[in-house]
């Protein structure tokens, strides 16, 4: 019997196996940010240990940064965490993309754009959305702070091998429907626990037609389905994306030869399989307090079926059978490690070009990195957004989570391109609706959700 992509990635990194069936995996890349690392570094100091492979460790600042004025950090805890990361990176000789550095940005955006993320690697970070890097056929997953310390000290991690789930995507996406809608459809259909104990492998003709940034969106939210990780076999688009980046392999042709072996064999069998015809999908919007509480834009909100839904309706201030078009939007956030890359901003800019944000709506565009921001500004996208009434910000995690000044006031609704809509995720009492960049941009113009398929726009972005 053939091997799955998961098998090939896993077996390549086994250092040892213990009597309990756990495998000691070698870690090729450890990404670090300011929130989950302080205790890990302190643990090293208390044990008189050092970082085993600082050359395989890379740090950035993203969660706590105020994106309106990156140097005006007024929160004591945020400032302490940022200062601590600087000190730790200096002491342990770790590369750091600090505030103001041209490489700074959200950890799961800068990894791929710097060429740190390449096929075949094991990648970990003290952040649940590390699964993003699986779009490059890397086995990437989030870890806890104690595990961060273990990787810093040993460059290894004890893990139990997950099962393999195959998700086949067939057909062509309709206009106005994007990778974000695919993953929201999967969550709405199969729930937030479908992937528990699995690694999701996305494959099929739809995947091959996707660009790398769309694939990253899919893998980013595999964790929302309970999966350990999301992975995609590499192809020519993968190789072209990586080629020429700062940390890409020097002997690139040799690397591509090895990477080309990373695929699921034709006679391999998945432990679970799902098949989806994406040509039948529509734009999605979440209405509740977990990512599976989502509907097509042309559907009504559901009837209450259990206590969780009853609580969600009460928290969100919505009613069963209500139309998604009637949800009032006061805030729009285009950003996060899910949808803050150049193609995401281009789509949003195409929607709002020559139009105006609805009175009373606060709309933010937060590029995922300094590089994304620079490229967007070279294309004039910042002018398009600012003339429409959006705020153009500096890179950071921003309104994805309530850890910095970018928050949603209690009781108000936000159309967000982020990945989580839990109670209080964007601030105490905030009401979050997860959507694609196109849906978020359109909501900013109307002050409520609309079917972006009916909007007039194209992908040709220029500013004049």
Curated annotation (Swiss-Prot):
Cofactor: how bound: Binds 1 [4Fe-4S] cluster per subunit.
Record keywords, A-Z: 4Fe-4S, Amino-acid biosynthesis, Branched-chain amino acid biosynthesis, Iron, Iron-sulfur, Leucine biosynthesis, Lyase, Metal-binding
UniProt record, GO biological process: L-leucine biosynthetic process
Keyword check for Membrane: no
Binding positions for [4Fe-4S] cluster per the UniProt entry: 337, 397, 400
Catalytic activity: (2R,3S)-3-isopropylmalate = (2S)-2-isopropylmalate
InterPro entries: 3-IsopropMal_deHydase_lsu, Acnase/IPM_dHydase_lsu_aba_1/3, Acoase/IPM_deHydtase_lsu_aba, Aconitase_4Fe-4S_BS, Aconitase_4Fe-4S_dom, IPM_dehydratase_rel_enz, IPMI_cat
Pfam families associated with the record: Aconitase
Entry annotated with the keyword 4Fe-4S: yes
Superkingdom of origin: Bacteria
UniProt cofactor(s): [4Fe-4S] cluster
Oligomeric form and interacting partners: Heterodimer of LeuC and LeuD.
Annotated HAMAP family: LeuC_type1 (MF_01026)
UniProt xrefs under PANTHER family: 3-ISOPROPYLMALATE DEHYDRATASE (PTHR43822:SF9), HOMOACONITASE, MITOCHONDRIAL-RELATED (PTHR43822)
Role played: Catalyzes the isomerization between 2-isopropylmalate and 3-isopropylmalate, via the formation of 2-isopropylmaleate.
Similarity remark: Belongs to the aconitase/IPM isomerase family. LeuC type 1 subfamily.
Protein name: 3-isopropylmalate dehydratase large subunit
Biological source species: Bacillus cytotoxicus (strain DSM 22905 / CIP 110041 / 391-98 / NVH 391-98)
